[in-house]
Every structure is written in structure tokens, then in C-alpha cells.
Amino acid sequence: MVEEENIRVVRCGGSELNFRRAVFSADSKYIFCVSGDFVKVYSTVTEECVHILHGHRNLVTGIQLNPNNHLQLYSCSLDGTIKLWDYIDGILIKTFIVGCKLHALFTLAQAEDSVFVIVNKEKPDIFQLVSVKLPKSSSQEVEAKELSFVLDYINQSPKCIAFGNEGVYVAAVREFYLSVYFFKKKTTSRFTLSSSRNKKHAKNNFTCVACHPTEDCIASGHMDGKIRLWRNFYDDKKYTYTCLHWHHDMVMDLAFSVTGTSLLSGGRESVLVEWRDATEKNKEFLPRLGATIEHISVSPAGDLFCTSHSDNKIIIIHRNLEASAVIQGLVKDRSIFTGLMIDPRTKALVLNGKPGHLQFYSLQSDKQLYNLDIIQQEYINDYGLIQIELTKAAFGCFGNWLATVEQRQEKETELELQMKLWMYNKKTQGFILNTKINMPHEDCITALCFCNAEKSEQPTLVTASKDGYFKVWILTDDSDIYKKAVGWTCDFVGSYHKYQATNCCFSEDGSLLAVSFEEIVTIWDSVTWELKCTFCQRAGKIRHLCFGRLTCSKYLLGATENGILCCWNLLSCALEWNAKLNVRVMEPDPNSENIAAISQSSVGSDLFVFKPSEPRPLYIQKGISREKVQWGVFVPRDVPESFTSEAYQWLNRSQFYFLTKSQSLLTFSTKSPEEKLTPTSKQLLAEESLPTTPFYFILGKHRQQQDEKLNETLENELVQLPLTENIPAISELLHTPAHVLPSAAFLCSMFVNSLLLSKETKSAKEIPEDVDMEEEKESEDSDEENDFTEKVQDTSNTGLGEDIIHQLSKSEEKELRKFRKIDYSWIAAL
Amino acid sequence: MAGYKPVAIQTYPILGEKITQDTLYWNNYKTPVQIKEFGAVSKVDFSPQPPYNYAVTASSRIHIYGRYSQEPIKTFSRFKDTAYCATFRQDGRLLVAGSEDGGVQLFDISGRAPLRQFEGHTKAVHTVDFTADKYHVVSGADDYTVKLWDIPNSKEILTFKEHSDYVRCGCASKLNPDLFITGSYDHTVKMFDARTSESVLSVEHGQPVESVLLFPSGGLLVSAGRYVKVWDMLKGGQLLVSLKNHHKTVTCLCLSSSGQRLLSGSLDRKVKVYSTTSYKVVHSFDYAASILSLALAHEDETIVVGMTNGILSVKHRKSEAKKESLPRRRRPAYRTFIKGKNYMKQRDDILINRPAKKHLELYDRDLKHFRISKALDRVLDPTCTIKTPEITVSIIKELNRRGVLANALAGRDEKEISHVLNFLIRNLSQPRFAPVLINAAEIIIDIYLPVIGQSPVVDKKFLLLQGLVEKEIDYQRELLETLGMMDMLFATMRRKEGTSVLEHTSDGFPENKKIES
């Protein structure tokens, strides 16, 4: 029974990984990246998330290794705190409260007790670089208010600040200026690009900066794709710079290798360029990284690089420019055209991913499963280029078929449209292209749906298009005597008075097809393709259309653009009820009759859950999001919950996920976020000595089971312990005031003996059968024992003697029994 | 990381006949040799023994042809009236034929005069055959009777009078000397057993039966009339399949030497080849006149077809082309390849597999390196534009997608631009290429408009293109008019409101495309 709290909206999974540069651990085993309010620790070898460091209350804006202790990590956040973590155990060590919003964090090995942060103090768009002195204190929370100003009027992004040559200077760029602050001299030099006054060449403003680790050399990236290497900048007059030009678009990030022999740069071309010896001739490329390179970072050991990409991915690259691992989050780079879908096989969330791909994202493990390349063309990442977009996708026949639609429209008249049908192949466990249809319609396809009835023998697909037609596609046997082949062909084309077809939907049993033509809903018989009836409410174009399910299958729901939700009864062919609701998203639950509708108002979005049979909603939650909600989907639960309260019953069998305009994936939950943490993430506590390899997971699991067994036995013993409290000796010892007790030395033996006694009786009770055997054994061993006791008697002939001897023999007995037990287990094992 | 993805070349369904192994096999014949006979060729029969001569029955003569001779090597012409159905015995030494006057004559291949004459039929004998034991002859005649003759003493052994119309076809079983089959115009096919005095099986074909054929195993029977029907003899004459691929009466049947294919010739001037497993047509031959007879030589080496106009068409299989071994390019010695092949892996060795190299087309290699003009040059080469225009179009489309089509088309001299214009002129009006090429044509016009008039060659090409576009616009207008008329007709015929039927149209050109020159 789950404790029923209020239903809350929780952010689930898929947070950004590419917000800031990733940071490597000193031994390159782990990589850290900021992810919303958390810091995530990944293994560089297995790509698994090892820890999630949570504690910040706002966006984490910077992370750096503690230069004094490589097992610790600093992080700063917009909540105004700097936190120090032990990343191996995932423990928060210390919190420094600064008090103002922190935008970036830098550490220097030379400045031992202070870190540098970017803050904005006075005005919202003026940022300063300040150094914060971190006070030494043993307490968990420390106030760090000692700020000293370093540089003013700088760019907010940490890419525009770099510390160089072991902390001798700091370089900052903004627009057309490069300023260098020397810590020793406490002076600032400012350099301006000569051409910046000339308006014609105004595209060369600075985008990022990096400093050579050992030499006095600053590299700066520019908007026009050039990289400038500045030298001799100690002198305002005699400074020089050289140009490296390969990028044709903005340089997004720069990084020097640890030794400084090579410079890495990346940009929109999705190519990592390595400039060797800072010359234009010696360059190496790692092309086709998939998306714009946002950040580049280098491991302190120098063996790995990593690039963060705009499609929410981190690629770990070996020194010899070979990609070795990819950490992929939910791709959020681009707008979602396909909406949210659930793959019936993997239960993964499916939506637009990388350009031209569909991504399969596991909600349970918050991890991308795989990308399906739909468009299968070389991706040219260039500004202003009209790309082929994957606009529609649908799963059919229990995941056996996938239909996708891609389009590219350069001008009004030039539309490229392609529909592809993919079949699931059990052997390869993936989708294989079956049929490709060029220009299935004359205009954009607005809706796509499969007939998912259980008893349908022939897979059927319906597409609705703006050209006024809807087409029915069926799978036909195309095989001849030479080869077997199945393909999709058009079976029927329907239209209604040349109106644009906007939505289509099959009823649950597949017997009826509803197609909306602007304001009119038409119902077609799916066997004969005859028009059965039409509904028209004259309340604006139909935006959403869906049939009721299970007991409510006689109802058809339609939401119009003018904010009317209508429910028609298919038996009486009349309007059952309507409601004024500006529905943005309407999704039926596949496991129940419920339908979720999200309405949009000026204040925010509200959720209504209702059954088509009654106009009164089951559940209303106002203000689920301040933004527009774009898509929603019901995800069937693996294990049904059992909420008894009527308001929460709709969450029993499915969970509702929705995606807002800023592409954050949210859901409804009654649990607190700590509870929601999956046990898997807790299992992955990596031990220091063990690298997290697949073997570790096998062996580690095994060991864990053993540990659990041990724990169980320990628990059993622990349970028995309270009984020992009843023993008078102990209670006497514990409850008598200390000053009236005899000396501890005297009491000790008594206390220990009492414990032993109780223990002995317990075990005897536990294994009554063993007792006999024990006795036998005792008799067998009696000779020895007697010898021993005699010896004891010989050595110590004190008054107390007898009692102690007796006790000792008892303890002896116990030990013997222990040995015997081990013996037996060993025999059993044989 | 993912490698370079080659440009997807749009594939278009190949119109016309599909190329299968059957079409390749049955097309692999030389051009037919035509031999003029005196009358309609009613029967062609190959000798089952080498040298595989064949007997052709036409009018009152029987000609024996050698396989590659165009003149008959022997002629039997002692018939008073039309001869029918000259058939070789299994050993190829005897020949039997029926005739219009009701006689059945047996010839020795080497002799001239008939060895035996079987008299007994009162009307024309259209079918004769040897039984499997070689010593009997079966004949069917227009007097509705089927007779069995003994060769040694030229006597009639049995007479079956079960048919109620002309008996026009028959064949003897190749396994059992006592079984034979006849087909008649009374719509039945009957199986007779010489050991009994009546038919053992009768199937109703439904139309007059023109030809029958028994499979070598004897399990299946094929009868041809208006349609070809296949019967399962082991199930007591159950109809297996009815083949309705000819649109006139089927006159002759034949099995290929492998027994895998069934051939049928018909009055509709076609020979069709069926698979005997699926009974689907796998190939079809066309002839000049209605076909009356058909025969295949041993190993399908020759197809002989006799027609109503007396023409005998003989097709010989092409001899297996001996491939001229090209002078081999000098390659590295075998030792180079074998070097290190048998090296055993040592303990500390790390095996590094070389990744398989992906082969890229030349244009793909250029595109991979962003050499766009070069890639376009490559596909505008005349060998590519004529043979595989879809590759050229796909590359133009890809360049357009990359937004560099204008760059790739610009800066060309007279010769190069005329290459491009030639390609456009040839392919612009094809509906499958039109959307891409119209866009390319517009870009070309935009680029080269300022320099127009400098080269008479290019100017002529532009004028040609303009004429083409104008013609196409007229054509499209006409099509739209036709479509409008058809719409009107459909509208009058439509029964129900609301439903509509899509008319498939070949929309090619939006009309707003004007090419100026």
C-alpha cells in the first residue's frame, strides 16, 4: 500500500548533460557533468552512471576537481552555494554558502584556499569574476563571504575565461576585447581586434578562450571560424598573434592538451580538429560526431578528451582521436515533430532524436537505448540549410511495424515527401526497411495511424493529408516464384468535399475509422470503406480525435481549435456532451477508459482526466506547467499501483508523461524524488579498488548476495540481542548508579559470562537436534577436557576458581562446538 | 563514429517484364529460322534419340528435318489426303501417322514406303501414338473411336467407342504399356486400359479438348482446350488447377526437358511457359501467326513451332559464349598475400583486425570531401547520363539538399554547360525527374542569363529547352482538360454522396514554370 500524498509534477530523466564542460577525474576513470540540479558521475569505460550527486537546489553551473585533493569535487550552483563532494562514495562533504547566484567556477592549484566564481552583483547583465576564500572549518555548512574582485565586465559563459601558465594570469574575452589580468602585477592588459572598428568585418567577435598550460600563449576562438594565438601579451604594444583557420562557422570551444603540444577546436561542423604544434599544416580531424560540438575538455592524465554536443551527448575520445565511449542523454536539440510514442516491445519512449533518427529512450533506466536511422543520409550541419525532417511516426501491430514520414520543403511548391515502413526483425532485434513510398500524398501528411485491432489479419495504415485525401495502405503479398516479398500498397483513397484531412483514428476493435476534415468528422467502415456518418459541430477545426476504449468504445471525442471538447455517441449518432476546454493535448490511456486532456490558458496548463461516458472529470490538476505542453503519452506501468482514492485511480495502471515547449519531460507522481531513485543506481556503488567493468557487475552482484546473506544472519543475531536485556545481571549493571557499583574489573567477567550463558542457551534452543550430538561429542572429548580442567585447577587454586573454571569450560565448549559446526558444513559441502 | 553515408540513389521500378532466371533462360535463343511448309503445320515431333531429328506434318507430307538443316533430309509424301500426327517411336526408328482418309501408316525412318497400314477407321485419324512397349499403336479418329493396333501382324486389337464426338488428341503413358489417354470434342478426357474393354477414368474438361499431355511420372494429366487444365490422376482425376492465361484456344502442349516447365501454344499467337510447381506464367513468346504445334528438343536446345500459315519457326539455343580471358593485370605475387598467414599468435601479441574498407563510388568520394563541382562533373559524363540518369538526378538532388547546387553549376565553359543542357533536354519531361530538374534548370538560367548570346551552341540548347517546356505545358493543359471531362463523367455516375474515387494522374509540371531564354 502506497502512502497517498498529493500528486505532484516531477521532472523525470533526460536532463541536459551538455550545459557545461565535463570534467575528468585525475585517473580518467570517471567523468563528471552537470545535469540540471545534479552532478552526474559516469564511468569513462562502461558509460554507466555511477553516482548522482544531489544536494543543490538550483541549476548547477560549474564543477571542478579540488586541486588539493583529487578525490574531491567542487560544484557551484545558482542557489548560491559551493559544495564539496567525495565523488567515489557520492557523499556531500561540505557546503560553502556564498549567497549570490554563481554562474561558473574555476579552481587553481596555486590559490589553495580560494576558488574563482562568476557572479553578477549590481545589474543583471554585468558579470564579475571574483575569488572566494573558502574558510577552513569542521562544520558541514560554512559561510564564505570573503569575496575579492578580479575582473569586471566579463562574459557569463565560463568558456570566455581561462587561467594560464600555472595561474600567472587570467584571460577573459567579450565581444571584440581580450583582457588579461596578471595576478602578480595586478594589472590588466586589454587588446582589441583591429578590424572590430571596421563594420564590414564585424563577424570576428570572440567566442571562447583557452590558455596554454606551460607557455605564455592564449588561443581565442572567433565567430568567423578563425582561431588566434596570442603571444607576448605582457606588452600592450608588442603583442603578436597568428591565425589558424579551418572552421567555416563559429568556433564553439577550444582546449589545449595537457602538455600543450596540441590544440583542440570544435564547432558546428561536428568535426574535432587537433592542431599540432600550433601550426596550420599539422592538423588531424575526427569528423561526423553527429552534432555541434559545444564543449571540449581534456583529462588531467592526458589520455582522454571529451566533447559535449548539442544533442545532449558526451563523446569520450582517445588521445589518438578514436571515439571510445558515448554517453547519450535524451536528445533535445531539435523540435519534436513525432510526439511521444511508446514502443510496444521495449516500452521505451520514442521521439525525434538526432537529425534524421528516432530515439528509443528507456524511462526506467533514464538512458537511451538506441537510435534508429530513418533518413539514412549524410547529415550536413550548416546554418540556414533546410534539412529533411522526420515529421511523423507510428507503431503498429504490437511493434511489428513502424511507419515514418519525412519531408523537406524548400519553397511553397517544392515538397519532398517520403513514407517508410519498417518491419521488426526478430533475428537482428531491430527494424528493417520494408517499403519506401515517394510522395504518398501531394501535400504534408497531418496524421498517421495503424489499425491495432487484435484480430486484424492484414496490417492496415491510414494517412491523412492536407491535400484533402486520406489513403489506406495495406500489406500485400508481392511474392512470385523466385522470391518471397511483402510490401505496402495503397488500397483506398477517400476524400470529403476537398476539405483538408486533419486527423485520423481507428476504433479499438478496428471496425471504424474516423477521419476529420477540418470542421467535420467522418466515420468510415473499415471493411468496405463506406462513409457511415458525419458529425459537425461548427466549432472550428478539429485538433484532436480519439475513440473511447473498453466500456466507452461507443464514444468518439474531438477537440476543436475554438476550445470545445465534444463527445459523440456512435450508436445514436448524436452529440452526447460538450465542454468548453481549450485542449492542447488529448491522450487516451491504453489500459483503461480514461482520457487525459491538457488545456492551455494564459496562466499555464491544466490537466483533466475524464471518462468519455461522463462529462465530469475524474481528476483535475491546475497549473501543471507554466509553459505550453506540447505532447503527452500514457506509459503502461510494469507493476500496477494500488491507489484506492478515487482521484488517483487513473494512475494505477499507467503513468502520464508530458513534454513542455522547452522540452523538459515531466510526469505525475505521489512519491518523493528520493523514493523514486531506482535501486539500480544504488547498486552501482563502485568500490575504489574495482573498476566498474561488466565483470564487476557479475561478480559484484554475486558478492552482494553473499553480503545480503551475511546481513540476514547478522540481523537474526541482532534480533536475539534484546532478549539478553532481560538477564538480571545486565539490567543490574545498566540500571545501578555508577557510584555504587564495584570496580569495572570485577564486574567485567561477570558481565561477559552472563552474555555467554545467554548465547549458549539460545543456540541450544535453536538446534535441538544438535544437542545430542554435542553431548556425544562432549563425552568423546571429555578426556581432553578433563585434562585441561585439571591443568587449570593445578595452575589456579583460588576461591573463585570453581565458578570460573566451570564458565571457562563452557566457553571452551562453545568454541569446540564452533569448530565442529565448521567441520560439518565442510562435510556437507563434500 | 558513424562513417560517411553514401548518397541514396533513388530507384524506380523497372517497367515491362521483370528479369528473372526464366526470362534469361528462355530468351537465350538465336533469331528464329523460318521454313515455309505447304500447309498449316499440324504436328511437330522430335525423335527421342540422337541426332534428334524432327518430323513436321503439314498438308499431305511429312518432312524429317535434321536439327540444324533448313532443308528436309527426308520426305514422306505418299498420302492421298492430309496427313496428321507424325510421331516417332521411342527408339526413333519408326514413325506413325494418321491421315484424312482414315488410314494409319507406319514408316521406317530409312525406308520410303509404309511398313504397315492399319485400316479400320472410317474417318480422319487425328491422333496416333506408340505405347510404352513399342509394339502397339493407339489411334483416335473422327468416327468417335479409339483403336489399339498390333504392329507385328498389323491387326486391330481393341476398339473403344466411348467418346461421343471427334477424338482429336491422345497420348500413351510412358511407363505402363497398357495405359493411354485420349481427348475428344465431347469435352472429356478418358483414360483407357488395354487390359479392360472400357475406360478406367474420365474427366470433364468443359470445352472441346485439343491437346492432352501426361507427365512422365503419370501422376498428372494436362488437357488443353479453351483453357489449360491440370488433373491429378492419383486422386482419381481431381482438377488441380485451371490456367486461363491464353485468350484463344490452346492447341498444343509440351514439357521442358527438365519437367519443371510446361509450355502451351495457342491460336492467340503466344507460347506461354508455366512453372509446374506454382503454375504461374514465367515467360511468354510471341509468334506471327496462330500456333498449331510446338516441340522442344532434347535439353531444350531447339524450340520448333508450327503455325497456321504454314511457317515453321525454329529457334536454336545460343551456344555458351566462351568468355575471352582478358589479359590479366599484373598483381602482387601470391607470396605477398600468403605472407604471415600461418603465423601463430604468441602470448603477448595483440591481434589487430583491419577494419573492412567500405567501397565508395567515385562521386561519393568527391562528395565526402566536399568537391561538389567534381562530383557533378562525374555524373554529367555522357556514359552516366545515358545509362543511369537516376544517379545524375540523385546527385543533383543531394547537392540541392546541401545548398550548394548553384555553386556546383556555376563557372562552367561552353562545353560543360552544353553537357548539362543536353541532360536537361533529355530528361526534363520525365515525371520522375521533373521536380529536381526544373529546379536545376531555373538555377542554370539564373546563373547564365547575363552571358547569354555569347555562344551560339548554348543559345540553341536554351531555345530547344524552351520549346520542350512549352510543349510540355500544352500537354499538361490537355491532360487537365481530359481529367475535367472524366471528373464530369464520374460525377454523373456517382451513386453516393461523399465518397469519391481518386483518378490517378501523371502530374508533372506546375504550370507556372516558364523558361525564358
UniProtKB/Swiss-Prot annotation, chain A:
WD repeat extents: 4-43, 47-86, 90-131, 145-184, 193-231, 237-276, 279-318, 324-362, 376-423, 430-474, 487-525, 529-569, 574-611
GO annotations of cellular component type: nucleolus; nucleoplasm; small-subunit processome
Gene3D superfamilies noted in UniProt: YVTN repeat-like/Quinoprotein amine dehydrogenase (2.130.10.10)
Residue numbers of N6-acetyllysine PTMs: 466
Compartmental location: Nucleus, Nucleolus
Keyword hit for Repeat: yes
GO MF annotation terms: RNA binding
Phosphoserine carried by residues: 664, 672, 779, 782, 796, 811
Ranges of Acidic residues composition bias in the record: 769-787
Keywords assigned by UniProt, alphabetized: Acetylation, Isopeptide bond, Nucleus, Phosphoprotein, Repeat, Ribosome biogenesis, rRNA processing, Transcription, Transcription regulation, Ubl conjugation, WD repeat
Cross-link (Glycyl lysine isopeptide (Lys-Gly) (interchain with G-Cter in SUMO2)): 123, 427, 676
Disulfide bonding pattern of the chain: none
Region (Disordered): 763-806
Superkingdom of this protein's organism: Eukaryota
GO terms under biological process: positive regulation of rRNA processing; positive regulation of transcription by RNA polymerase I; ribosomal small subunit biogenesis; rRNA processing
Assembly and interaction partners: Component of the proposed t-UTP subcomplex of the ribosomal small subunit (SSU) processome. SSU processome is composed of more than 70 proteins and the RNA chaperone small nucleolar RNA (snoRNA) U3.
Protein role: Ribosome biogenesis factor. Part of the small subunit (SSU) processome, first precursor of the small eukaryotic ribosomal subunit. During the assembly of the SSU processome in the nucleolus, many ribosome biogenesis factors, an RNA chaperone and ribosomal proteins associate with the nascent pre-rRNA and work in concert to generate RNA folding, modifications, rearrangements and cleavage as well as targeted degradation of pre-ribosomal RNA by the RNA exosome. Involved in nucleolar processing of pre-18S ribosomal RNA. Required for optimal pre-ribosomal RNA transcription by RNA polymerase I.
Protein name: WD repeat-containing protein 75
Native species: Homo sapiens (Human)
